[in-house]
Amino acid sequence: MIKEKNNLSLTKSILLILISISIAVGGQILLKIGMNRMGNIAVNSMSSLGHLFLGVVKSPMVLVGLFMYVISAAIWLVVISAVDLSFAYPFIGLTYVLILIVSKFILKEDVNPIRWAGAAIITIGVVVISRG
């Protein structure tokens, strides 16, 4: 499960995985907030692509969200250099759970019981896979 070349302990590996996931979730939330401020964008022509690009460049929320993705990816590269991908990757499922929680409590989105049940199943799945 853990490769010796980078000498990461299991605890440190899991911590880095969770940090990477949390930063990615934070980035996704900032992207959503930034895009909500921009409004709906219909990409049906080159001019609308230009409008999207200009909107992104002018939006601090979107730019910071994208930067957070870069940081998350850098941490992820450290993780997968040290642990098996089959161990690390299932933790990505926790992004769905965290997005659900943050969407409910920060973005004030409606989350129905079926989604909560799905989040519970995902969490159980990640725990089972990580112990295997």
Residue ranges of predicted features:
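Polytopic alpha-helical membrane proteins, predominantly small-molecule transporters/carriers
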Residues: 2-132
